[in-house]
Amino acid sequence: MALEGMSKRKRKRSVQEGENPDDGVRGSPPEDYRLGQVASSLFRGEHHSRGGTGRLASLFSSLEPQIQPVYVPVPKQTIKKTKRNEEEESTSQIERPLSQEPAKKVKAKKKHTNAEKKLADRESALASADLEEEIHQKQGQKRKNSQPGVKVADRKILDDTEDTVVSQRKKIQINQEEERLKNERTVFVGNLPVTCNKKKLKSFFKEYGQIESVRFRSLIPAEGTLSKKLAAIKRKIHPDQKNINAYVVFKEESAATQALKRNGAQIADGFRIRVDLASETSSRDKRSVFVGNLPYKVEESAIEKHFLDCGSIMAVRIVRDKMTGIGKGFGYVLFENTDSVHLALKLNNSELMGRKLRVMRSVNKEKFKQQNSNPRLKNVSKPKQGLNFTSKTAEGHPKSLFIGEKAVLLKTKKKGQKKSGRPKKQRKQK
């Protein structure tokens, strides 16, 4: 029995050694270590390494993982994607394959927050504001073509605008010169009857030269909807209007000067026309008189009769409203000579149709404005009233206007006040 027990123990030990042959630490003490035991455990087959359960085998065994690890993207990349601009995202989406586009677009939309949307809106608003400012600067920089920052296209636009402005100025200057030359060939004809037309007027002036054109002015249409041009063509004139004016343009300047002979002639009963050059204004001021406080319904014939005694009258003009044709209450009388003007000034405060007239010399508006603007001219025309050089004293001697003497007199008065204290001292001494 004892032998059988010993054999059983030996068998158990051998079985344990067969199950764990590599485990030199557990099964055998450190004195039983054999050379090459570690190397043999390292270079053994897979089935031996998997089957071993000892400590040494577990340390040096390299077991392959049965499940492969799942690779998760780094969180930094997601942060960069959120901070990218819309343009970079669009370019990256174009480069990606078509199969991956829809899934990633959905992710990008989900990742955008409200704050990011607000930032994008602000950036777009700032970009639009910058564009508007650039447009305004381009319009305002007409004189800054020489700057290096200006683009070539902008310079071309500015040059074109300057060229148009210069061309318009040249056209205006040319038109002014043409009008000036045309005015020298033009004759003003006033106080024409309403029934007068172009044929009658041309036949009246045809003996002096060829007529280029005839224009009627100071027409008042019968209806408010009609223009003056249509009223002149259709002859639909206001019934209260009795006279009109016209301009006759000759082809030669000599013909216009000869046509002045018709000034004062009667073209119809009660209508004495006045003829004058359109360019002549200076000589008219010296021979004309301003008449104010006129009745509103007065006619030229009544004013002419009132000033007949002063001399031969060349023309009478009443200033009327352009829309209604009613007189504004003042007018002008043009005489043949300047001597008649002195006689007409004596008719100041004379009555006409129950109104006292105000008669004055006719003054050029430009000269009158210059006198008002220059105070020196006013002082020259009006001498000071305070200085009378011919005034005399009661003794008959002229007064001395030397300012220094007056100042000395004032000083002597002050000295006299001081002297007034001296006799008091003398009285005390006495």
Swiss-Prot record:
Residues 1-55, 72-123, 134-153, 365-395, 411-430 are annotated as: Disordered. Pfam families: RRM_1 (PF00076). Keywords: Acetylation, Isopeptide bond, Nucleus, Phosphoprotein, Repeat, RNA-binding, Ubl conjugation. Residues 185-280, 287-364 form the RRM domain. InterPro entries: Nucleotide-bd_a/b_plait_sf, RBD_domain_sf, RBM34_RRM2, RRM_dom. Coiled coil: none annotated. There is a cross-link at residue 242 (Glycyl lysine isopeptide (Lys-Gly) (interchain with G-Cter in SUMO2)). The modification N6-acetyllysine is found at residue 151. It is found in: Nucleus, Nucleolus. CDD domains: RRM1_RBM34, RRM2_RBM34. GO terms for molecular function: RNA binding. GO terms for cellular component: chromosome; nucleolus; nucleoplasm. The modification Phosphoserine is found at residues 14, 28, 99, 288. GO terms for biological process: maturation of LSU-rRNA from tricistronic rRNA transcript (SSU-rRNA, 5.8S rRNA, LSU-rRNA). PANTHER family: EUKARYOTIC TRANSLATION INITIATION FACTOR 4B/4H, NUCLEAR RNA-BINDING PROTEIN SART-3. This is RNA-binding protein 34. The lineage of its organism: Eukaryota, Metazoa, Chordata, Craniata, Vertebrata.
